[in-house]
Curated annotation (Swiss-Prot):
The keyword DNA damage does not apply. Assembles to form an icosahedral capsid. One of its GO terms (cellular component) is viral capsid. The gene is orf44. It is found in: Virion. Pfam families: Phage_capsid_4. It comes from the Viruses. Its main location: virion. The keyword Secreted does not apply. Keywords: Capsid protein, Late protein, Virion. It comes from Staphylococcus phage phiMR11. This is Major capsid protein.
Amino acid sequence: MPQGITKTSNQIIPEVLAPMMQAQLEKKLRFASFAEVDSTLQGQPGDTLTFPAFVYSGDAQVVAEGEKIPTDILETKKREAKIRKIAKGTSITDEALLSGYGDPQGEQVRQHGLAHANKVDNDVLEALMGAKLTVNADITKLNGLQSAIDKFNDEDLEPMVLFINPLDAGKLRGDASTNFTRATELGDDIIVKGAFGEALGAIIVRTNKLEAGTAILAKKGAVKLILKRDFFLEVARDASTKTTALYSDKHYVAYLYDESKAVKITKGSGSLEM
């Protein structure tokens, strides 16, 4: 049995591990790193948010010569979203800490980080998948991407991100040919982490959370992540069993803030494989 004085290096210290968990989380994010984070509600009472959300004003219309161009109303609607709490708990015995292979304490932290990262990412993806703008197109083709971009009806392109299955991303890269820009050539001014490259002004991010044939094209500001409370870490000691439990939680909600800034791409029956 190890002898000597117990030092801080042998213990689980929340103040040290909390920032470490945050670092583990940020490395794994794909969708959540794209969301705009709002922390203004931290410390405020209540668990249900009533928030404004922009409503898409409709596609452009054909106007005959000499006729007035109709004006559409840009509306906001009130929506509600209930704050969610996600949590993770692990427990480890003194025997495991003292005699376990590898680094059980470090693995606890890693597992907490991965668990939170996946849940937050999934919730942001769920919000994006609720996009009101949709298009049936083959996203493995450059003209399929162009069809999605056209849904924005922009005169001047704004920064946008294409979230796409890795297999589809490879096919799109091949079809884009000289219209594809490698990630190493994009510089530091990228609006999202994990860029694979760029085509037609869209930063391409690969993710296995989307099935082949399905993709999301979104502009910054499409989705928001409201934080009620960020990571909170607690340690509970059970002397009777000589175990130390680690608990972490986070309170937040992800929602589609601007419907006009997200397009869901699916490969419908009208899209032919070439």
